[in-house]
Amino acid sequence: MIAAFCDLCAVSGDASALTQAQKAAQSIVLHRSLPGDGFRHDDADPAGPYLGDTLAMGQAFLELYNVTADRNYLSAAGRAADFIAAHFAPLAPGAGFITSSTRTDTAYPPHPDRDENIALVRFASKLAFAVSDKRYRDLAAEAMRYLATSSIALRPLSAGILLAADDESKSPLHITILGAPQEARAVALHVAALRALASHELIEWRDPADHNPLPTNVSYPNLNHPALFLCTATSCSSPTTEPERVPALVRRAQTLKQ
């Protein structure tokens, strides 16, 4: 739900959708947090924690970062991924991340769920790019290893595995806005990037006055005015200063990526 509200805000400009997403995230953090930055399903999880709950919040934090550029959300997404790696790791290499770290009963040991592993690949691969951290790329690769086994990949309704494989093997479209948050042109470029939001896309905003470590390792030229860059796995655009040009820039990059 949080990710859906973020997408609605991005493409429509509905600020109330972002407010709802942020309130939902705050409520879950307040009432469902676990030690170690995971999340529980209810007030008590007799058989938990469950992979799906922390995975959903990791996805939510990453989408909130994408629309707000608030790096606190990016850090929270990373902590969720760390919890997943620590608590739901495959019981054997290539066996898939398990749904729960606790047996539901003696006859039903923890097992992997295909859809959860698909979602994990897509989340972890995007996060790996967003923070330039190989640990999350390895997390995605391990989940993909399970999905690629013939007994899993050839089951009916396997289109999600193709999406996961595509996300894991290709870098997301990477839009970066350079400019101070109070500069009208930088704000307009960010809004244009949100309205043109594509699947498997990362939006980053760099404030020249912010000297904290950057999440990604892509270098850009120093400019004396706000600008937007769009990068693929192989190239970056020239700086764009006109918000109205952004949709066409994204469409062209999507075409070249296919």
Question: What does each of the following model-derived ranges do?
Answer:
Residues 1-258:
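Glycan-recognition and catalytic cores of secretory/periplasmic carbohydrate-active enzymes
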